[in-house]
C-alpha cells in the first residue's frame, strides 16, 4: 500500500504568513476563513490515512491467520481409520469450529 504523503501539514498552513504589499490585495478575513477550511480538510485526510494504514495491517494479519487455519484444516486429516473412528466426534467438532472461524475471517477480510 503506498503512503499518501502530504506536502503541507495543517500546522504549516496555519503558520503561513504572506507578504503584505501596498497594492490592493485579498481580504484578510476571507483568506483566513479559506485556510481554516483547508486545515480542517488536511486534518481529516491525515486521520483517514492513519485509518487506512491501520486497516491494511489488520487485513494482512487476518489473511495470514486465514491461510494458517486453512493449512491446519488441510493437514488435520486422519492418519488411519482406527484413529479416525475413535476420535471422529472430537475431530468433527474441532473441524466444524475451525471452519466456522475460517468463515468468520473470510467475512471480516472479504466482506462477504
Curated annotation (Swiss-Prot):
One of its GO terms (biological process) is cell division. Divisome component that associates with the complex late in its assembly, after the Z-ring is formed, and is dependent on DivIC and PBP2B for its recruitment to the divisome. Together with EzrA, is a key component of the system that regulates PBP1 localization during cell cycle progression. Its main role could be the removal of PBP1 from the cell pole after pole maturation is completed. Also contributes to the recruitment of PBP1 to the division complex. Not essential for septum formation. This is Cell cycle protein GpsB. Keywords: Cell cycle, Cell division, Cell shape, Coiled coil, Cytoplasm. It holds the Pfam family DivIVA. Forms polymers through the coiled coil domains. Interacts with PBP1, MreC and EzrA. It comes from the Bacteria. It is found in: Cytoplasm. The lineage of its organism: Bacteria, Bacillati, Bacillota, Bacilli, Bacillales. The keyword Cell cycle applies.
Amino acid at each position: 500500500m503506498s503512503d499518501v504523503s502530504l506536502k503541507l501539514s495543517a500546522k504549516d498552513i496555519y503558520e503561513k504568513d504572506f507578504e503584505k504589499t501596498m497594492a490592493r490585495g485579498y481580504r484578510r478575513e476571507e483568506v483566513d476563513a479559506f485556510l481554516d477550511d483547508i486545515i480542517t480538510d488536511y486534518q481529516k485526510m491525515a486521520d483517514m490515512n492513519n485509518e487506512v494504514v491501520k486497516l491494511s495491517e489488520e487485513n494482512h494479519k487476518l489473511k495470514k491467520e486465514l491461510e494458517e487455519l486453512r493449512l491446519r484444516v488441510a493437514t488435520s486429516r486422519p492418519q488411519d481409520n482406527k484413529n479416525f473412528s475413535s476420535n471422529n466426534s472430537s475431530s468433527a467438532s474441532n473441524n466444524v469450529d475451525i471452519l466456522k472461524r475460517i468463515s468468520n475471517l473470510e467475512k471480516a477480510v472479504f466482506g462477504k
